[in-house]
Amino acid sequence: MKKLIAMINLMFVCLGITFAKDITISVGAGDNWKAKREPQVAIWLEDTDGNYIKTLYVTERASHKSWIMGPKEGRPESLPVWYHASKFKPAKNAAPDLKLDAVTSATPKGGIIFETELEDKAYVLRAEFNTSFDYNDFYTKKTSGVNGQPSVIYEAAIPADFNKSSEEIRLTFSGTGALDGSDGLIHKNTEGLTTAQTIVKLVAVVGK
């Protein structure tokens, strides 16, 4: 029986057929989740070489570019790492150059939870969060515009064999986005961050 299963699996590999696995992604709201403004959120997949694959979740305002009194160039600084990775233009009058096959919603009051499917491959899961007007003594209104503190990014490696029921992987903090949205790099300098680090209390992936 084991030999038969092994032969079937080998046949699927040779034919390039991959299996899908169900996962649940949850974001626990932190103390600063809605302290000043509702946060903007993007959650997406990359391959292990850092190439963008697809967006799994993004807040409506970021995806629809519906910024209140926002400039015509939009708000690239709101979710700069995601905007650059996905090549989704933040400008209000930009053409819809990217079709988002993702869960999209207004920011929930108490965190986020949704289900999705992944192929049996290795991935990097990234999540970016930002709250506008989140000023402090380091990121002042004079020096940081409407952004306040920069976006914060969390990530985790999802192995190809991640399909065990109730197995959990938690994303860890990996850095910040560009304060002015000028690049899509994850900056490791966290000097001056305060409340931005409490937008979320956890981001987790659970196998089903």
What are these model-derived regions, one by one?
Residues 2-13:
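Sec-dependent signal peptide recognition
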